[in-house]
């Protein structure tokens, strides 16, 4: 096989195309993985529209699992036929951040099939910018993790998303028996956070999203944690300007929530959720919301609030998820709500953008 099907962007979000390109050959330090399952995330299209991709044309996608199809001459610890997940976060491996389990802060960090996080020279990203929404992907050998036999390819393809939820929960520094608010709770990050909450001692959940029926479905993932829902479409029409969401959160948690895990990509939810945080509590944001906060520095000072931004998980966060899956302490098959063939990748992208139906974690199977 000399060519493969891949989902490519040529200039921006309006120029996606499914096309045949050459199957990659491994360099000395590479492996080539035959992709069995690849995750699909709406943030890709947003970043394309923002012009955040440094190399175009490129193959999209940053979450994948499959089997090793080829091994470079200097690659160690991996063999043809191994079941693996691809850890597509590129970093230098030598800086202070990489050496202290903070590799997502590395100045060189970027994501295959996604975007770079700053404008500096990034030789690894230059070499490995092509992503995983294809039949094969070339990746440095040190960025594949062995996949336990008990973990299926579809779930393995979403380990990075679950690792991001683990990272957000860690940043929240939750006490045992905590109350947390999860915004955008019906998406991939929200559903992963609900699923993982019991592993972080959460005692009460408050889920925020647009529609009650979708929120109630996500509440079923909590493993028995008491869960309340706040449907934005049930708030007064002027909630965005009157602070009605803040008021509702305070009704449900009169003393305030210990933390808000906020995955909203735009709008006033982030700021209003911040007002529902208890004194000394934390809002962890991983939604890319560009709407300014309503709170003043004085409000943060007087309430001793922490606002923590996070852009990715660490490698160890992802490995922690794999261990939970391997031992059975975490099950995640029910999170995979949609499966698309690679031949329908354009339709899959459209479905993810529209979200006409409940969708937690969609995957593409080449």
Protein language model features and the residues they cover:
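NAD(P)H cofactor-binding loop motif with strongest signal on the N-terminal glycine-rich segment
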Residues: 184-185, 288
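Hydrophobic/small residue at the entry helix of a nucleotide-binding pocket
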Residues: 164, 188-189
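NAD(P)H dinucleotide-binding glycine-rich loop of Rossmann-like/cofactor-binding domains
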Residues: 92-181
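Glycine-rich phosphate-binding loop and adjacent beta-alpha segment
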Residues: 202-203, 219-225, 264-329, 366
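C-terminal hydrophobic helical "lid"/dimerization subdomain
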Residues: 1-4, 271, 315-366
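Glycine-rich beta-strand-centered segment in the early N-terminal region that forms part
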Residues: 24-38, 50-99, 103-104, 148-150
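Adenosine-nucleotide cofactor-binding segment
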Residues: 182, 198-268
